[in-house]
């Protein structure tokens, strides 16, 4: 009952907070030359990663929401099109982390809550995924491991 007695200004101030605080969102770093091999070896992940970079540049809430929906779909496609060389527990675990932060961002955005910390965590998860792919490549010097599946 005490919650109902709060002034309206206190209740509405929480819902008027900006959903995305762009000045506190890091941009997704670009792939360096050691990571470009992802483009040819796992096109579905590369497509997901490239579109993810636009999250920090969405000009409106509507476009941000549409981009989140698109990324959830692209992430699912990337997991279903996982190449044989990427069938590693470390890759699957990193993709689950990315999936979790992507869905947390979508949920908070739908609830009109700020999402800047989730976006930063999502970008960190994608960066960690990139590093895991490079480590996997470096640990396996067998050139046949990274030949595109046919």
Ranges and model annotations:
Residues 1-3:
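C-terminal motif of bacterial Sec signal peptides marking the signal peptidase cleavage site
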Residues 6-66:
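Immediate post-signal-peptide N-terminus of mature secreted/exported proteins
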Residues 18-39, 104-150:
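C-terminal amphipathic alpha-helix
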Residues 49, 72-75, 99-102:
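Extended amphipathic alpha-helical scaffold segments
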Residues 54, 61, 68-81:
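Short N-proximal segments of mature Sec-exported proteins
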Residues 58-62, 86, 112-113, 117:
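Short helix-adjacent coil turns
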Residues 65-72, 88-97, 116-124:
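Short, charged, amphipathic alpha-helical segments
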Residues 76-92, 109:
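Short, solvent-exposed, charged loop/turn and helix-capping segments
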């Amino acid at each position: 009952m005490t919650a109902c007695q709060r002034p309206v200004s206190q209740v509405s101030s929480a819902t008027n907070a900006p959903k995305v605080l762009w000045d506190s969102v890091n941009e997704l770093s670009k792939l360096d030359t050691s990571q470009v091999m992802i483009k040819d070896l796992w096109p579905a992940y590369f497509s997901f990663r490239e579109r993810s970079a636009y999250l920090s540049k969405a000009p409106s809430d509507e476009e941000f929401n549409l981009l989140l929906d698109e990324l959830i779909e692209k992430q699912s496609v990337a997991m279903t099109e996982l190449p044989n060389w990427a069938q590693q527990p470390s890759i699957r675990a990193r993709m689950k982390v990315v999936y979790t932060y992507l869905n947390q961002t979508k949920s908070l955005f739908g609830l009109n809550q700020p999402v800047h910390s989730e976006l930063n965590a999502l970008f960190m998860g994608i960066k960690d995924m990139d590093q895991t792919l490079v480590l996997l490549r470096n640990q396996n010097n067998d050139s046949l491991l990274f030949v595109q599946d046919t």
